Amino acid sequence: SFNFCLPNLSFRSSCSSRPCVPSSCCGTTLPGACNIPANVGSCNWFCEGSFDGNEKETMQFLNDRLASYLEKVRQLERENAELESRILERSQQQEPLVCPNYQSYFRTIEELQQKILCAKSENARLVVQIDNAKLAADDFRTKYETELGLRQLVESDINGLRRILDELTLCKSDLEAQVESLKEELICLKSNHEEEVNTLRSQLGDRLNVEVDAAPTVDLNRVLNETRAQYEALVETNRRDVEEWYIRQTEELNKQVVSSSEQLQSCQTEIIELRRTVNALEVELQAQHNLRDSLENTLTETEARYSCQLNQVQSLISNVESQLAEIRGDLERQNQEYQVLLDVRARLECEINTYRGLLDSEDCKLPCNPCATTNACGKTITPCISSPCAPAAPCTPCVPRSRCGPCNSYVR
């Protein structure tokens, strides 16, 4: 704060030991003149010519103060102009905030993301191919196991038929053995019969001719042949029946196997298609999840980047606003100081004019003789009563006013 009140210019002087100093030398101040003594030029302190010296000193002091105030006003004006030029230059030179160019990095990131997505799709395609190969291997393994089961069933059926054929062969052998035994028995019976007939003939000779009406003999060969034919027909019939049954069972089993194989093939094909569809959907779902994650990460990074940029811009705006506020405050303060200085200058010029008018209007002159009884105005001055210029009582020091009247309103 500036206190532009003038210092107390009242001369706090005690009466000197010079002879005949009047007792009316108490310091008084001019009203509204910042404690400028009013008895300057009227009280004969230092005889004739002291008024001119005090006036010169006062005027010199006031001129120096006025020159210093004017110099300070000019300095403040220069500082204000310099600040205004700096503000203008700063506002002209300040470039808008340019965000760094990350387009090349973004393009590189996009290319890398595309490569990653291509690699992921290629990996997914390879995984699908591997799964398809595994499914095809499973299908071939299932077919192999099915064919192996069918082969085992056919082999078991063939073994069963072979056992039946062996049993039939054994039965045929038994029947052939029985036929041979019956043939041998028939031969034995025939030979025994012929022997008996020959024996009887030899005993009876020709004496007896017996004619016996008997049933015609049975042809055993024919009977055996018929029996053989019947058994062979029966065996052939049984064999044909068994073969027909086997063929029917085999055809039915083949039909069932074919239908089951077709159903199994269709089911396996459908399962393979469904698995492929599921794998493709899983791959697509994984790709969508990855895309969503990448987009979320990109969104998060973008939000973070733009929030950081926004914070930087806000901080820059805050700094600029604070600088502008400080500059405005400085400008207002300097304007106020400048205004105060202008007011002080005007007040000082007014006071100087007042002092000059007072000094010019002073028509009383100091006497040349310090012990004169009259002054230039013809007024009587009381002579010194004391003996050879004894020192008078000390003058009461000038009590300064509590405040300067004209300058009080400018004290900050």
Curated annotation (Swiss-Prot):
SMART domains: Filament
Chain positions of site Stutter: A304
Positions where N-acetylserine occurs in the chain: S1
UniProt KW Coiled coil keyword: yes
Region Tail, residue ranges: 363-412
Cross-referenced InterPro entries: IF_conserved (IPR018039), IF_rod_dom (IPR039008), Keratin_I (IPR002957)
Chain ranges of the IF rod domain: 55-366
Coil 1A: region residues: 56-90
Segments for region (Linker 12): 203-218
Annotated region described as Coil 1B, given as residue ranges: 102-202
Signal sequence residues: none
Residue ranges, annotated region (Linker 1): 91-101
Region Head: start-end pairs: 1-55
Top-level taxon in the UniProt lineage: Eukaryota
A GO molecular-function descriptor: structural molecule activity
GO cellular component: intermediate filament
GO biological process: epithelial cell differentiation; intermediate filament organization
Alphabetic keyword roster: Acetylation, Coiled coil, Intermediate filament, Keratin
SUPFAM superfamilies: Intermediate filament protein, coiled coil region
Region (Coil 2): 219-362
More about this protein: There are two types of cytoskeletal and microfibrillar keratin: I (acidic; 40-55 kDa) and II (neutral to basic; 56-70 kDa). The low-sulfur proteins, derived from the microfibrillar fraction of wool extracts, are composed of two families, each consisting of 4 homologous subunits: the type I components (8C-1, 8C-2, 8A and 8B) and the type II components (5, 7A, 7B, and 7C).
Role of this protein: Wool microfibrillar keratin.
Family in the record: Belongs to the intermediate filament family.
Designated name of the protein: Keratin, type I microfibrillar 48 kDa, component 8C-1
UniProt organism field: Ovis aries (Sheep)
